[in-house]
Amino acid sequence: MEKIKKFNTQIASHLANNLENSLRELRRCGAHRSSKATFTEMGIQLSGFKNDLAENNKFNALVGNAWIDNEADYYLPAVMTVDVQRQEQEVTTYVLNDHGNNQRVIMYLTGGAYIQRPDKTHWQYLNRLAIATDAKIYVPIYSLVPHDTYRTAYQEIASLYSKIYTLMPASKVTIMGDSAGGGLAAGFCEYLGKKGLPQPGHLILFSPWLDLNLTNPLISKYEDKDVTLAVNGLRKIGTMWAGDTDHQDYRLSPLYGNLDQLRDVTVFVGTREIMYPDVTLFVQKLRDAGIAVNSYTGRGLFHIYPLYQIPEAKGVMKRVVATINN
């Protein structure tokens, strides 16, 4: 009983500090974050994922659970209203909203720190995305740590992408990704450029993980504000994901890759998350390389905020729809 009380006190203290810091930042920048965004951020904090990454015993449990979960058959949460088909090829892939060959296509790479499969929030967002865009959406359940490294995931995604662009012009394809999936999407597009393969018409990223080692010194200023991610835990997962490959390889850290072949990039990031500094740097590098890029910063908002059902995400959805249908 004493242990539970201690835990609850700790969580309450963190929540109070988080709310106080949030209000202070909003007053300073003059933004007006919705109350729903504030309560959503609290819910994310209560989920405990950041603690799972930050604390050694919880991190070990996270990896242990992943050994079991990531080898088990994947079951889709019962939240979808659009048509869903499951394809078993090189990689298990869910195809959403397929009703013809004239649709635009999205290949969406879900985040989860390279250790967790897509969760309910992902599928709720993807359902809304399918309705808003009327696009056909491919969602591969790509391989993750601790069983596999990025090499397996790249093979799976490359196989799926090649099948997609043989069915339609690559210009009608959009690659999207959030968090780790956003880093994977960016690295994969750099890989396409290196291999001389066709780029998608659009690349849309939500809070992408762009440097596997998270070495930017500015990140330390944002870690306390970030209710989702902890640097040390991500670095340990990154080591597993990389295998024997240098962590600055563009497939792992697209921030350091050749950006010249990318086209029409759109990036969203919040100011209360550790990915913010590297996203800012990535956008500047894209502009320096002459790549068309649109960057949107959610002031006072959290990691992958566009995926959540908050008022601030509605404007993001409109921009995503306009980009995909352009």
Short names for language-model regions:
Residues 88-94, 101-326:
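Alpha/beta-hydrolase superfamily serine-hydrolase fold, recognizing
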Residues 1-100:
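A glycine/proline-hinged amphipathic helix-loop "lid/cap" segment
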